[in-house]
Amino acid sequence: MANTISAERRIRLTKKETAYNRYWRTTMKTYVKRAKKAIESGDREAAEAAVLKAQSVIDKVAVKGVIHKNEAARRKSRLMKLFNQKFQ
């Protein structure tokens, strides 16, 4: 239990920030899953569109501070590696 007003305020803020971060993190994971599924389907055009959208969402999440920029770069790199292995 919080003993001060500022501690109570931080608890409220933490809940709000956690919900915000969870929303963007799950959105990012959803788009990455869609991209991986499109890559596995073998349709190059659909996979390319899905990968580009996933990269866009990953960049947005990094700009918002939900994930670190290096994590964003790593996720995009791994996604492109899968894409290139499948279609080259």
UniProtKB/Swiss-Prot annotation:
Residues forming coiled coils: none
GO cellular component terms, A-Z: cytosol; small ribosomal subunit
GO MF, any single term: structural constituent of ribosome
Superkingdom as given in the UniProt entry: Bacteria
Known function: Binds directly to 16S ribosomal RNA.
Organism, as annotated: Coprothermobacter proteolyticus (strain ATCC 35245 / DSM 5265 / OCM 4 / BT)
Annotated signal sequence range: none
GO BP field: translation
Entry similarity comment: Belongs to the bacterial ribosomal protein bS20 family.
Keyword list, A-Z: Ribonucleoprotein, Ribosomal protein, RNA-binding, rRNA-binding
HAMAP family found in the cross-reference section: Ribosomal_bS20
Gene3D superfamilies to which the protein is assigned, alphabetical: Ribosomal protein S20
Protein name (record): Small ribosomal subunit protein bS20
This protein's encoding gene: rpsT
